[in-house]
């Protein structure tokens, strides 16, 4: 009876693919709401284009076109001059989730999960029923035209039709065409136009063209010919890993011993550190064997203070025996490392001291390029920026914060906070983002901005990391990590001080202009009076007074400008 009931219960048991999961939960990828869904779709395609161009060393040219086909029904076209996609990878790139060139690597990139563009293809498929048309070539081969969809049950790309065309001109790049329904184009601060505008600011080396549904062409011209240096893959840091990381990496490594595996595949681990690790694991094993709670607490205190050799010595022969056992772990093949041993390694790492992880692999926008981007797109009267030194969060994940500030000029009244992660604009979920809280918690009145919400002020904040701590798979909000919050706050205060100095100089200049006009107003009257008293010609006296005023205010102007430039 029990068996038959169990059979009935498990009759509907089904293994769900990752594609099927995200088909049912598209909101987790950012496809929620008509406006946001369209922006997310464009974001995924443009991000792919920029990353591909930069990795291939090509200055990006990206063209986006939205054609209205009906009510809440659009055709989306995104074309780039990137390296193109080899024929055998087309189905995987556009039709298989959790597949890509970057998701498995510890490297800074705009996309992190290997879901992006395949998620867009799936969204087009489930809203319009149409496959996505891909036209691509690597330049040296034929042009491939393929209609791609996703088999959601298998999480596999499916090519419905494929045509090969001759390529006499050597065209190279990728063009994506997809039909989507249940979306809406609106020119708002969460729409496609604003997204592309913000993308152009943070990527001044990119040329971006946009054709709106009404046919209007908008061009965000390239303002820098300097291609960003490609980011470097970085080894994981001992303070930023979990047991599963070590265990899985140990199963895949080609290294012959646990010692060489740890030294070769993690940063800041040397032979000396391995010897230290052996001592910490030994000390932890011995402490766990101790039955008396008071003694155990005293030993843990000594462990925290780094007195591992004294702890081992206090156990006499038992300590030496455990030390020999742990040393053997370091010399065995990594594939034979047990889960418990991996746990011991991670636990020991927590008590050890390591140099901060190397940060050479991070690639910020850079102060000069931030200022070029803000100036070229926003045309302010004042612009400044700061790139903070690299730091780490969660003990071992490197990150860097940079902030740009633009004020006045063609900026309209109203504070604009431009949030970015690895150069990618974050348009949604601002309330839960650490960038918002850090920027808003500044007392702007201290920096001569009396009402920040009405000031013609734009603040760009970019968080750079090999692993940005997003709050969700939609990747629109950065989690509130204490170290990141503090770095943003310090960077914002830095540029705010520069703004205050500029505004102070501007106010003094206006005051001096007012004083000069007042003095000049009295020149004719004073000239007449002095002429009567001295007998000198009135015109000559007037000329002398004007010269005195000019010299006086010329020196004041120079002093104010020098202070503003400092």
Swiss-Prot record:
Question: Main EC class of this protein?
Answer: isomerase
Q: What are the entry keywords?
A: ATP-binding, DNA-binding, Isomerase, Nucleotide-binding, Topoisomerase
Record's InterPro entries? HATPase_C_sf, Ribosomal_Su5_D2-typ_SF, Ribsml_uS5_D2-typ_fold_subgr, TopoVI_B, TopoVI_B_transducer
CDD domains tied to this protein: TopoIIB_Trans
Q: Which SUPFAM superfamilies match?
A: ATPase domain of HSP90 chaperone/DNA topoisomerase II/histidine kinase, Ribosomal protein S5 domain 2-like
The protein's matches in Gene3D superfamilies, at most eight in alphabetical order, are given as: 1.10.8.50, 3.30.230.10, Histidine kinase-like ATPase, C-terminal domain
Name one process (GO BP) from the record: DNA topological change
In terms of domain of life, where is this protein from? Archaea
Q: Which reaction does it catalyse?
A: ATP-dependent breakage, passage and rejoining of double-stranded DNA
- Residues binding ATP are 48, 80, 101-102, 111-118, 475
- Give the EC number(s) listed in the UniProt record: 5.6.2.2
**Coiled-coil region:** none
Q: Which is one GO molecular function term here?
A: DNA binding
Enumerate the Pfam families for this protein.
HATPase_c, Topo-VIb_trans
Do you know which NCBIfam families this protein is assigned to? PRK04184.1, top6b
Primary role = Relaxes both positive and negative superturns and exhibits a strong decatenase activity.
Q: How does it assemble?
A: Homodimer. Heterotetramer of two Top6A and two Top6B chains.
Instruction: Indicate the family of this protein.
Output: Belongs to the TOP6B family.
Protein name, UniProt field: Type 2 DNA topoisomerase 6 subunit B
Tell me what gene encodes this: top6B
